[in-house]
Amino acid sequence: MAKFEAPQKDDLQEKLVAVNRVSKVVKGGRIFSFTALTVVGDGNGKVGYGYGKAREVPAAIQKAMEKARRNIVSVELVNGTLHHPVKGRHTGSRVYMQPASEGTGIIAGGAMRAVLEVAGVHNVLSKAYGSTNPINIVRATVDALVHMKSPAQIAAKRGLNVDEIRG
């Protein structure tokens, strides 16, 4: 039975990062299915990723989009860039990102670029080390963004004011 859902009006940007054909070997031969990796974001500090698998590509993409919408996290940005250099990792993938001046653009590869675009980052320098598997790169990028702290958050944690933190 097919599910019917009204189109969502949440103004999220959606990006398809990767589609992959996978197979399961059974006694009668191979059963093919498709996986899809997607990222969604509002372009203003909210970003999520999802991974879907189905027998047909559109169904896999739809599942991935639904999972991405349920998996949204908030990231605090400043003037379209990061607060400070950050590192993230997931399994064999490591990412490094640092803030960049206005006009630099998003200097990032494939999967990392998609995450940064939908998150609302406009100027950043980044590099991926180790495995460049798109799933791991997306997870490492989101990990790095989540662990980034603003000066106000650090000051509150230390019980100081922002001016004392900045020195």
Curated annotation (Swiss-Prot):
GO molecular function terms listed in the Swiss-Prot or TrEMBL record: rRNA binding; structural constituent of ribosome
Gene3D superfamilies, A to Z: 3.30.160.20, 3.30.230.10
Domain notes per entry: The N-terminal domain interacts with the head of the 30S subunit; the C-terminal domain interacts with the body and contacts protein S4. The interaction surface between S4 and S5 is involved in control of translational fidelity.
Name listed for the protein in its UniProt record: Small ribosomal subunit protein uS5
PANTHER family linked to this entry: MITOCHONDRIAL RIBOSOMAL PROTEIN S5
Domain of life assignment: Bacteria
One example of a Gene Ontology biological process annotation: translation
Subunit structure: Part of the 30S ribosomal subunit. Contacts proteins S4 and S8.
UniProt cross-references to InterPro entries, sorted A to Z: Ribosomal_Su5_D2-typ_SF (IPR020568), Ribosomal_uS5 (IPR000851), Ribosomal_uS5_bac-type (IPR005712), Ribosomal_uS5_C (IPR005324), Ribosomal_uS5_N (IPR013810), Ribosomal_uS5_N_CS (IPR018192), Ribsml_uS5_D2-typ_fold_subgr (IPR014721)
Transferase as UniProt keyword: no
Gene Ontology CC entries for this record: small ribosomal subunit
Physiological role: With S4 and S12 plays an important role in translational accuracy. Located at the back of the 30S subunit body where it stabilizes the conformation of the head with respect to the body.
Alphabetized Pfam families for the sequence: Ribosomal_S5, Ribosomal_S5_C
Gene behind the chain: rpsE
Domain S5 DRBM: 12-75
Keywords: Ribonucleoprotein, Ribosomal protein, RNA-binding, rRNA-binding
HAMAP family: Ribosomal_uS5_B
Family per similarity comment: Belongs to the universal ribosomal protein uS5 family.
